[in-house]
Amino acid sequence: EASGQYTRELDAAVAKLEAGIANLMEPEIGHLTRLLSSGGDVLHVQCAGGTDTLSLLLVGASTVTGTDISPNMLAVAEEKAARLNLDAEWVLADTARLPETLHNRFELVYTGRGALNWMMDINIWAQNVCACVRPCGHLFIFEGHPLDWVWDETARALQIQPDYGGYFDTNVASDTEWPTSYIDADMEPVAGWSKKHERQWTLGEVVTAVAQQGMIIEVLSEHPEYYWDAHPLLPWDEMKKLPHTYVLIARKPAE
């Protein structure tokens, strides 16, 4: 359903990549450049339209592979790579059931920017993504901070959503529509759109799930930058005092 947004943005995404501009944010770039200083095979889990995947080539990746559950998204990603004459592998796969052919293949497994909220079992997620990391390789997560789910996005002053259970809420949010900050605000819902299910995972839950796979936590940092316009009505002077994203880097021990 949301692939239409990526199709409409295809020309702009290709032009940006062609100009050598990575679709990555400041909190990510320094870490990624360091981790990929000697190159490496990179897997991007839940790659959507592939712009971020191909951007990883601009910060040092030797090869990139993207997985997504949507064949339409992968078709958009493949078109971008073809236009740019870039070699990339695209794999149709559910993150909760990544194929064994991806296991232990990658120096870096990259994910985030609205990926974990679609996972209904954080431990199964961790088991799958960590299985794809080579010994001595890294898992890299750049994700929205779970605290952002607490704030009322319709308010003009910082306040907790009145109908939300708080930071530790484990309820699943379900809707047939997409956020207007994710797709065009004027894109009308289509009859028959599937119901989407999201839930938030606390920092503690994410870090624990990764650590329980035997990964060694190297970096956990929090940042004021948004990767999407989550609170358009709230003043930036106030919101910049809070974390809106985080970076988690974990290393798989040598065998």
Short names for language-model regions:
Residues 146-156, 189-205:
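Acceptor-substrate binding/catalytic loop of class I
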Residues 138-182:
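Conserved class I S-adenosyl-L-methionine
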Residues 100-109:
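A short acidic, Gly/Pro-enriched loop at the edge of an enzyme's catalytic core
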Residues 7-40:
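Conserved alpha-helix/loop element of class I SAM-dependent methyltransferases that forms part
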